[in-house]
Swiss-Prot record:
NCBIfam families: uvrC. GO terms for cellular component: cytoplasm; excinuclease repair complex. PANTHER family: UVRABC SYSTEM PROTEIN C (PTHR30562:SF1), UVRC/OXIDOREDUCTASE (PTHR30562). Residues 11-85 form the GIY-YIG domain. The UvrABC repair system catalyzes the recognition and processing of DNA lesions. UvrC both incises the 5' and 3' sides of the lesion. The N-terminal half is responsible for the 3' incision and the C-terminal half is responsible for the 5' incision. One of its GO terms (molecular function) is DNA binding. The keyword DNA damage applies. This is UvrABC system protein C. Interacts with UvrB in an incision complex. HAMAP family: UvrC. Its main location: cytoplasm. It is found in: Cytoplasm. GO terms for biological process: nucleotide-excision repair; SOS response.
Length: 590
């Protein structure tokens, strides 16, 4: 694209999208749209190449830089542009949600919504989330079994009898007492445990003073459980350090690891780690992408974030954090003292994580097509786990959704799955149902893939994309249409490759594995149906049943076999063949 072909650009904050046809190549934000976009034509390296490859430019003016930052993040997630830094392992880590109701409940969710609820997380380790949720359920009597929003019940549940719920669903809870419990749960989730323990100790002493010894004992047990949990589950630092996040980063060539540690009340609450593989991205671009994506959802926010090196344009991020937290959040690069030593700790651990990742890749012996696939589709890293999806049916009925899994470019058949579908003769509806159930049903806890392959054209691919959106997920996906072996994207873009291309060969193998997985189900079903019919026919014993199953496989083929052919089979007689044909004639068509 030439500079003279640019649309008129304002000197205001906003977001710009470099495009090649309908494909978005890069999304960026700017204090001045005009100055930032025009700078691409005087730049070198990646920026210059983006301008040269682009055939068009869209822009959206915003009121301020914070709005531009938010819009940039949303557009990057929506379009996953080729030249933006995309974080690997964007697996939608779970959050704890304290619902916005008169009697709130605590839920595990994977999406943060603008619904007035309070969100805590993300929790990168499922075990940590499980432990804190179990602790809260045991020690604090929030409602648990009356749904969201709360449904009225006729009788209280067992939790009420055990003292673990105040039973607001049957009108037994005092609103003021319930809100006191909510406040205590918030203190635990925000890491303000020391203050909560002091408060509980005062209540215990007051209960003892009133001779309410049973209540005092309950509070004592609650305090001991909290102390035990927070002394064993978290690494203690200096309590004077308070609440903060600190980050470390390590890099080797195109591969980088960024880690963030969350410290609350002087204790490490958790660590979040991301892997990025982007040849041309600078360290600053990688760290900025991590900060933007993490702090758009993370909650609660600390008053201090320690960065490993300075970044340009941190003012917009600091302002965004201030608006989200309702107070100032300082972004600082300490050079000495205890906080600088925290950064050294984070960098050492990021370096260890990077070395582990490199050794794992070396041991895996990654398939050479994975790098070709990454480059072809503009993925943030080599796609280690691939899942292929296929819809098959038996004579227009019994539609089946089949899943094949590759890891490191090789089949992982122990994780192949199949599911019967409810959708009728609509292939698109069947694909949407199958993909949605894969990520919300009994298979939802399987690892998320780095790339989805859909057996079909743009219609099936878009149906899969709708299912992912309904499930609250953003995963790269592509379709492979039979016949011409053309790759298609959800936007309708076609990628035509020579059959010798390693990425295409790998995807064809994956698609065929998914298809064969479905066919195996239908063969098994035909055999079971035939076995059922043969069981009730006089003169057809176990040996003859086995022979007919091996020879014909299904009911239709057996019905079409001539009488003379059946009679000539080893172990069969003309009388047995006639009995078989008579029984088959009475069988309802499949």
């Amino acid at each position: 694209m030439r500079a003279q072909d640019l649309p008129p650009l304002p000197e205001t904050p906003g977001v710009y999208l470099w495009k090649r046809g309908e494909e978005v190549l890069y999304v960026g934000k700017a204090k001045s749209l005009r100055a930032r976009v025009k700078s691409y034509f005087h730049a070198e390296g990646k920026a210059r190449r983006i301008a040269e490859e682009a055939t068009g430019l869209d822009f959206i003016a915003t009121r301020d830089e914070v709005e531009a930052l938010l819009l940039e993040a949303n557009l990057i997630k929506a379009h996953r542009p080729l030249y933006n830094v995309l974080l690997k392992d964007d697996k939608h880590y779970p959050f704890l949600k304290l619902t916005n109701e008169p009697f709130p409940t605590l839920l595990v969710v994977r999406r943060v919504e603008e619904d007035g609820a309070k969100y805590y997380g993300p929790f990168p380790e499922a075990g940590a989330l499980r432990r804190i949720k179990t602790l809260i359920d045991r020690l604090f009597p929030l409602r648990k079994n009356s749904g969201y929003p709360m449904k009225r019940r006729r009788y209280p549940c067992l939790n009420y009898s055990m003292g673990r719920c105040l039973a607001p669903c049957v009108g037994k809870a005092d609103p003021e007492a319930y809100q006191e419990v909510v406040r205590q749960v918030e203190a635990v989730l925000e890491g303000r445990v020391d203050g909560l323990l002091q408060e509980l100790e005062a209540k215990m002493r007051e209960a003892a003073r009133r001779l309410e010894f049973e209540r005092a004992a309950e509070i004592r047990d609650q305090m001991e459980a909290l102390r035990a949990f927070f002394s064993t589950d978290q690494q203690a630092f200096d309590p004077e350090m308070g609440d903060l996040d600190f980050l470390g980063m390590a890099r080797s060539g195109a591969l980088a690891v960024v880690q963030l540690y969350q410290v609350r009340s002087g204790r490490i609450l958790g660590r979040i780690s991301r892997v990025v593989e982007k040849e041309e991205a600078t360290d600053e671009e990688i760290l900025w992408a991590f900060l933007r994506d993490h702090y758009l959802e993370a909650s609660p926010l600390p008053p201090l974030v320690l960065l490993p090196f300075p970044l340009e344009d941190l003012e917009s991020l600091a302002e965004l954090l201030k608006r989200r937290a309702g107070r100032k959040v300082e972004l600082r690069v300490p050079k000495k003292g205890e906080k600088a030593r925290l950064l050294e700790l984070a960098e050492r651990n990021a370096r260890l994580a990077l070395e582990t990742e490199l050794k794992l890749r070396e041991r895996r012996g990654e398939h050479p097509a994975l790098k070709a696939l990454q480059d072809l589709l503009g993925l943030p890293a080599r796609p280690w786990r691939l899942e292929g999806y296929d819809i098959s049916h038996l004579q227009g009925q019994a539609r089946v959704f089949s899943i094949a899994v590759f890891e490191g470019g090789r089949p992982k058949r122990q994780e192949y799955r199949r599911m019967r579908l409810k959708a009728g003769n609509d292939d698109y509806a069947a694909m949407e149902e199958g993909v949605f159930r894969r990520y919300t049903g009994s298979l939802k806890d399987l690892p998320l893939p780095d790339l989805l392959l859909i057996d079909g054209g743009v219609g099936q691919v878009r149906a899969a994309a709708r299912a992912l959106e309904r499930a609250g997920l953003r995963l790269p996906l592509v379709g492979l249409a039979k016949g011409e072996e053309v790759l298609v994207t959800p936007e309708g873009r076609e990628l035509r490759l020579p059959l010798t291309h390693p990425a295409l060969q790998l995807l064809i193998h994956l698609r065929d594995e998914a298809h064969q997985n479905g066919l195996r189900y239908h063969r098994k079903r035909r055999s079971e149906e035939l076995f059922r019919v043969l069981q009730g026919i006089p003169g057809i014993g176990e040996k003859r049943r086995r022979l007919l199953l091996e020879r014909y496989g299904g009911l239709r083929a057996l019905k079409e076999a001539p009488l003379e052919e059946l009679a000539r089979l080893p172990g069969m007689s003309l009388e047995a063949a006639r009995a078989l044909k008579a029984a088959l004639a009475e069988e309802e068509p499949a």
